[in-house]
A protein has these predicted regions:
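DNA/chromatin major-groove-contacting recognition/catalytic segments
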Residues: 5-11, 31, 225-240
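DNA breakage-rejoining catalytic core of tyrosine-based enzymes
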Residues: 30-55, 110-132, 147-149
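Basic, Lys/Arg- and aromatic-enriched nucleic-acid-binding interface segment
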Residues: 51-80
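Conserved tyrosine-mediated DNA breakage-rejoining catalytic core shared by Y-recombinases
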Residues: 86-137
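Short, polar N-cap/turn motifs at the start of nucleic acid-interacting alpha helices
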Residues: 91-93, 184, 203-224
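Catalytic-site neighborhood detector that most strongly recognizes the C-terminal catalytic loop/helix
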Residues: 108, 212, 216-237
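Active-site/catalytic core of tyrosine-dependent DNA strand-transfer enzymes
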Residues: 130-181
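Short basic/aromatic active-site micro-motif
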Residues: 159-160, 180-201
Length: 240
């Protein structure tokens, strides 16, 4: 299959079409190979898991409290401290298009605009929740826990706790003969995986930038680096 156009296209449309083609039948394995090649060559690309790998790993997190947090990282691309700050009221699960409101914690205001007495207002962003199973999981969790709208969902003091959950899940996977090329698997792995999953499914980079809370598009563009490795398959170029 030729992923590259014979007519004029923008760079973004090429990335979108190319990435979608990689996830079609027979190309999921190619996506895996590209990722593994980038890791082996120690390229400056975000390390991510593919959807089947994440769903496999989630099976080793049976605790519902832990599972809902990890699934939230995967389904929203939230930074760990953004996820830990979430309340029940931040989720809008009964809408025609379910979504969650995240408070962006990474962006910083210019020093000139910060004063001693100024109340820091965290910018908010909306992230669509595409997976119906995740939406149903959160609905069931909220019904079970009977949380108030302003109650923190995961009152965890340190993200080290979450790292320990993930470490335990990976160890359980290894006991069952399953290993992952990405190591260590951290909270940030799910953020990278979320971004790559959206790119593979053709979501525009500008939308992904908004979902991730990136101020600069260059921060999002880093996720397209992996596709440079695939160019050699589609151009017959000789230097002889």
């Amino acid at each position: 299959m030729n992923f590259f156009p014979t007519h004029n296209e923008t760079g973004k449309s090429i990335v979108r079409r190319h990435s979608q083609a990689l996830l079609q039948n027979g190309h999921l394995e190619r996506s895996r190979q590209l990722r593994n090649l980038a890791i082996a060559a120690e390229l400056d690309c975000p390390k991510y898991l593919l959807a089947p790998e994440i769903n496999q790993l989630l099976q080793f997190i049976p605790d519902l409290h832990q599972r809902t947090l990890i699934e939230t990282l995967w389904n929203t691309g939230a930074r760990i401290h953004e996820a830990l700050a979430l309340t029940k009221g931040d989720f809008y699960l009964d809408e025609e298009t379910p979504f969650v409101v995240l408070r962006t914690l990474k962006q910083r205001e210019p020093k000139s605009s910060v004063t001693k007495n100024k109340v820091k207002i965290r910018p908010k962003r909306v992230v669509a929740l595409f997976d119906p199973q995740y939406v149903q999981l959160m609905k069931s969790y909220f019904a079970t826990m009977r949380l108030k709208n302003q109650s923190q969902i995961w009152p965890i003091q340190s993200d080290n706790t979450v790292r320990n959950w993930l470490r335990s899940a990976v160890e359980q996977a290894e006991v069952n003969g399953i290993s992952y090329v990405v190591e260590p698997i951290t909270c940030k792995t799910f953020r990278h995986s979320f971004a790559m999953h959206l790119i593979f499914n053709g979501v525009p980079l500008k939308v992904i930038q908004a979902y991730l809370g990136h101020k600069k598009s260059s921060s999002t563009d880093v996720y397209t680096k992996i596709f440079t490795l695939d160019a050699m398959l589609h151009f017959d170029i000789s230097f002889r």
